[in-house]
């Protein structure tokens, strides 16, 4: 919320299992609750196709009062869902469908835009990366447990989504930071990058918050084999 208040974007890069989805749902719910009547709080969540309905299930479970819609169906049905999205509604779609439906979003302004598994836009030259950056949104947040998998250009692409120009053009970033840091092991270049991005990245590992996590509960459940599965020799 501090980043949003100051008109910055950010990366939530917590380790897997620390509840990034729930943190975002809580943030969206607070935005809806604290906004003035008639104020645009429309939100867009973009996620891998395999996680679309997981997002919907989590919203229904933890914030049942949060209006949310999965953009699904054929082209005509999806366009209707997008066109009729209210100013206090969360739309959930996949990267692939966003790319296909991009024109339908041109007349919508979003208060919040979330990209889950942000490594999907690590290659800034792909259509998917270009599509998410064309959405008009006031605040942008990226979720990923791996902000950098192989190259620093992946981090640049995510920040180009969050705050275009913050890490310069890619040509300047590559010349002044990426090449010196990677090819020539220039510690000054890496420190410069870390100093620039530190205020906008929240990353916690499980070991960092282990003392705050509840005890792990284990329960053994036995399921007998059915007759077709069980054969005596």
Please place each PLM-identified region on the residue numbering:
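ASCE P-loop NTPase motor core, strongest for the SF2 helicase catalytic module
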Residues: 1-185, 192-233
């Amino acid at each position: 919320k501090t980043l949003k208040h100051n008109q910055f974007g950010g990366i939530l890069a917590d380790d897997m299992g620390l509840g990034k989805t729930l943190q975002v749902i809580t943030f969206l719910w607070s935005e809806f609750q604290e906004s003035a009547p008639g104020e645009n709080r429309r939100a867009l969540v973009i996620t891998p196709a395999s996680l679309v309905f997981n997002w919907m299930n989590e919203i229904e479970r933890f914030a049942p009062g949060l209006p949310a819609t999965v953009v699904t169906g054929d082209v005509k049905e999806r366009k209707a869902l997008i066109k009729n999205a209210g100013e206090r509604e969360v739309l959930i779609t996949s990267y692939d469908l966003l790319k296909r439906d991009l024109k339908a979003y041109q007349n919508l302004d979003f208060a919040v835009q979330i990209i889950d598994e942000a490594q999907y836009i690590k290659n800034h030259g792909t259509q998917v990366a270009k599509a998410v950056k064309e959405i008009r949104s006031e605040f942008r947040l990226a979720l990923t447990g791996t902000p950098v998998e192989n190259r620093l250009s992946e981090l640049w692409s995510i920040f180009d989504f969050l705050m275009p120009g913050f890490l310069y053009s890619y040509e300047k970033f590559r010349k002044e930071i990426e090449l010196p840091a990677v090819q020539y092991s220039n510690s000054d270049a890496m420190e410069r990058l870390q100093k620039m991005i530190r205020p906008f990245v929240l990353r916690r590992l499980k070991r960092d918050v282990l003392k705050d996590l509840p005890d792990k509960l284990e329960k053994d459940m036995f399921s007998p084999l059915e007759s077709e599965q069980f054969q005596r020799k």
